[in-house]
Design a protein with these regions (language model features):
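PP2C/PPM-type serine/threonine phosphatase catalytic domain
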Residues: 1-284
């Protein structure tokens, strides 16, 4: 499977905060249609040096993927686990008494011969939108207290956005070997031209719900116009808010692609033998 993307679009806004704790990769203004991975990290609010943690994780993960991943090949979950461990080790090396509480969320989009692999920790979101059907095909499950309460049936989906506990996350990347949170990993092979992949920090969701998001991506406007609409829709946000969205230009099959699903299953099975252990899913 060979996936071509359009020019990626980045949003990187300070909001009403004094400092920017979000980090994105590629850096704003540097992404091209030749990039094969996209990273977003949101430094944990209320924790010291959240901006340091988000920068360390995004940069160290990007460095590992650049050095060890060939997008023309199937990327195994074992490689992802090694990349994540490298990011955790970078956090450990930066750990000191002044920064011991630093932490960050993580979102990753990784395009490769096997399709798209997504990985996330925390409450930063990943979406797969199909404008031709005018619907969301996939939304990542937040690692947060309110999402756990929603799953347990104690609050409604709408109440998650207004709950006083909405900022409490249950997983984050932090230094210290006792703090190795597991990511959620999803493999997506049903990709079509015109689809969008969207990653965002929770700040982007203050004034943009799923219906509005789906409507925006389903419009006939250009990607640059969609980016400007997202910026306008989130202009009054209090929190830092950042995002990347990537449009699929084309999807084609090549020699050997008939064995991709078996290869992916083998990769996931092998991933169970490494640390951290993944929660992997297939999305048809």
């Amino acid at each position: 499977m060979k996936i071509a993307i359009r020019q990626p679009q980045a949003i990187y806004e300070l909001g009403q905060r004094d400092n920017q704790e979000d980090s994105i990769w590629p850096l704003q203004g540097q992404a091209t249609d030749q990039d094969f991975f996209f990273i977003l990290c949101d430094g944990m609010g209320g924790h010291e040096h959240g901006e340091v943690a988000s920068r360390i994780v995004s940069q160290s993960l990007a460095q590992y993927l650049r050095d060890h991943v060939n997008p023309e090949e199937i990327v195994s979950d074992q490689v992802l686990g090694e990349a994540l461990e490298a990011a955790y080790q970078a956090l450990d090396q930066a750990d000191d008494e002044a920064a011991k509480k630093m932490g960050t969320t993580l979102c990753l989009l990784l395009f490769h011969r096997g399709g798209l692999t997504t990985m996330h920790i925390g409450d930063s979101r990943i979406y797969h939108v199909r404008p031709s059907a005018k619907k969301l095909l996939y939304q990542s499950k937040d690692h947060s207290l309110v999402y756990d309460l929603y799953q347990a049936g104690e609050i409604s989906y709408e109440e998650m956005a207004t709950s006083p506990q909405k900022n409490i996350i249950t997983r984050a990347m932090q230094p210290g070997k006792d703090n190795r949170c597991k990511p959620s990993v999803v493999h997506i092979t049903d990709l079509r031209p015109g689809d969008y992949l969207y990653i965002c920090s929770d700040g982007m969701l203050e004034q943009m719900d799923n219906d509005a998001l789906c409507q925006l991506f389903s419009s006939q406007d250009s990607d640059e116009a969609k980016r400007q609409q997202l910026i306008e829709a989130t202009k009054g946000n209090k929190d830092n808010h950042s995002a990347y969205f990537v449009g699929i230009a084309s999807v084609s099959s090549g020699e050997g692609d008939e064995s991709l699903l078996d290869d992916e299953q083998t990769s996931k099975d092998n991933a169970l033998n490494i640390r951290p252990v993944f929660e992997a899913e297939e999305v048809a």
